[in-house]
A protein has these predicted regions:
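Short, conserved structural patches
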Residues: 44-171
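Alpha-helical assembly-interface signal, strongest on the long, hydrophobic N-terminal helix that forms
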Residues: 1-68
């Protein structure tokens, strides 16, 4: 009986480890995708706030629970996320944007985006801080945390570089 419990705990620990690693890999891929979208947004001259919103929309699938409520007070579902994304991108003010879409990892600067012109290139970076699971999965997941975040946070960074042709045309 004890052996069965030990084996069950071992398999559950292995499952949670693989689940956490897969979730972090998915979030890392979405950060890379978001960085590419932010770099494209910067090439057409969008400001920093629009680049940040572009990163938010690109990382919706890995942004944690949705905090926006619908008209009846319930949480907004996946189909509503997709239909609300254009309205979110059109918002001018942050308070208005949070009424349309708001996720856990968008709050408190957990998902940030930046783009800068470097010579003839635009380099975009998307950073997302995500909480790590504690317990056996944390032993195998590697170091977690950074100087700015909680010690239980993992920092995922996505970067992209795109050639900037607009300086040639706008001179």
């Amino acid at each position: 009986m004890i052996e069965s419990v030990i084996v069950l705990l071992f398999f559950m620990s292995c499952f949670f480890l693989v689940f956490q690693l897969a979730d972090n890999l998915r979030a890392k891929l979405l950060c890379e995708y978001a960085a590419g979208r932010c770099a494209r947004a910067a090439t057409i001259g969008l400001n920093d706030y629009m680049i940040e919103k572009t990163a938010h929309v690109a990382t919706m699938a890995a942004a944690g629970p949705c905090r926006t409520t619908d008209d009846r007070g319930g949480t907004v579902g996946y189909r509503s996320w997709i239909s609300r994304a254009p309205d979110y991108l059109e918002c001018v003010y942050d308070a208005q944007a949070r009424q349309i879409l708001d996720f856990d990892y968008w709050r408190d600067g957990r998902t940030t985006a930046s783009a800068r012109l470097s010579g003839a290139r635009i380099e975009a970076t998307v950073i997302q801080r995500r909480p790590q699971l504690f317990g056996p999965a944390m032993l195998f997941a590697g170091p977690a945390g950074d100087a700015e975040g909680d010690p239980g946070d993992a920092t995922l960074v996505g970067t992209a570089t795109i050639e900037a042709h607009y300086p040639d045309w706008l001179e």
